[in-house]
């Protein structure tokens, strides 16, 4: 098996077929809806909150609300009252089952539910998928996180409508350091490996450092890319604002950090400061333009045309050209 990550790969251009990148369609369909970009901000407390999720939904972007210190039932009710879709996160503990029961009791059906735990290839996830499919069959269920083909096969067979691939490759995740496990350092290979057996959409989660990594993720099988650090640090971001030597930063920490949990127990995340980088809307526009450019370099007009390109690996024993692998 060939091992590489985002910084080891470059995609090879094909003849351009458009006059302007604005002719390229960067949209993607997930479930019953289409979204402007194959990108979703990470469901983390320092990345998204209720106002950001509402704005994303109103402007044609996908979102997943985090599951920490949140009344999911109230959130779903509010989003539907405002005429937009509801996309929530659940764990696999009793309070999460109680949330499902409350949603059913109130006749609320979230359009998207993400089962969001650190090690998603687990019987506990199997049980929650089954419960959701029984109680809320109208919800599109995303399950993760995972990092192997075996996990993709199992989660799909258990009923997941999409899987989320990535074990600890994120900027504020230290899973590989704390446990010795994960996809950190080879996330793009793991994505390629998992996509080979997937029959349903994959969301690549973590390891994205530059906008070009979005195109690389799509090339190797992702339908959607979850990003934390590039979305943290905006003026609207919920993280606490910190001033250091006259410069403004936003706090950004992992979901399994002690900062998020409020206690030092089973910690697999850390806290960093992200320089404030302006408005979220401006970043999303720039991302869309960059993805459109990627499509034009791929010789296409639609997002999935990126999957048709060849690529090269940079450096190491595996260096060389790879044709449509």
From Swiss-Prot:
Q: Does the keyword NADP apply?
A: yes
InterPro entries, alphabetized: Aldolase_TIM, GMP_reductase, GuaC_type_2, IMP_DH/GMP_Rdtase_CS, IMP_DH_GMPRt
The GO annotation for biological process reads: purine nucleotide metabolic process
What's one GO-annotated cellular component?
cytosol
- List the NCBIfam families: GMP_reduct_2 (TIGR01306), PRK05458.1 (NF003966)
Physiological role? Catalyzes the irreversible NADPH-dependent deamination of GMP to IMP. It functions in the conversion of nucleobase, nucleoside and nucleotide derivatives of G to A nucleotides, and in maintaining the intracellular balance of A and G nucleotides.
HAMAP family in the cross-refs = GMP_reduct_type2
Q: What is this protein called?
A: GMP reductase
Q: Give the taxonomic lineage as stored in the record.
A: Bacteria, Pseudomonadati, Pseudomonadota, Betaproteobacteria, Burkholderiales
Q: Which gene encodes it?
A: guaC
């Amino acid at each position: 098996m060939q091992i590489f990550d985002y910084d080891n790969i470059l995609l090879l251009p094909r003849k351009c077929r458009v006059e302007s990148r604005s002719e390229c369609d960067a949209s993607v369909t997930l479930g019953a809806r289409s979204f402007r970009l194959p990108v979703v901000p990470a469901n983390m407390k320092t990345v998204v909150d209720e106002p950001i999720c509402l704005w994303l939904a109103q402007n044609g972007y996908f979102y997943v609300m985090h599951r920490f210190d949140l009344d999911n039932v109230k959130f779903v009710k509010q989003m539907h009252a405002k005429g937009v879709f509801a996309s929530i996160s659940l764990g696999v503990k009793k309070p999460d089952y109680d949330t499902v029961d409350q949603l059913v009791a109130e006749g609320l059906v979230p359009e998207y539910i993400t089962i969001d735990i650190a090690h998603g290839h687990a019987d506990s996830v199997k049980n929650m998928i089954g419960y959701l499919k029984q109680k809320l069959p109208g919800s599109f269920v995303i399950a993760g996180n995972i990092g192997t083909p075996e996990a993709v096969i199992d989660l799909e067979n258990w009923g997941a409508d999409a899987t989320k691939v990535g074990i600890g490759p994120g900027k504020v995740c230290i899973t590989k350091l704390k446990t010795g496990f994960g996809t950190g350092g080879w996330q793009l290979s793991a994505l390629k490996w998992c996509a080979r057996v997937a029959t349903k959409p994959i969301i690549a989660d973590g390891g994205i450092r530059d906008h070009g990594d979005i195109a690389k993720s799509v090339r190797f099988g992702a339908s959607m890319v979850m990003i934390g650090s590039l979305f943290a640090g905006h003026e609207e971001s919920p993280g606490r604002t910190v001033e250091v030597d006259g410069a403004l930063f936003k706090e950004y920490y992992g979901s399994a950090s002690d900062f998020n949990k409020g206690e030092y127990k089973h910690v697999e995340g850390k806290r960093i400061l992200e320089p404030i980088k302006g408005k979220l809307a401006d970043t999303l526009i720039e991302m869309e333009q960059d993805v459109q450019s990627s499509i034009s370099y791929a010789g296409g007009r639609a997002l999935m045309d990126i999957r048709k390109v060849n690529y090269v690996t940079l450096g190491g024993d595996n260096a060389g050209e790879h044709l449509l692998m």
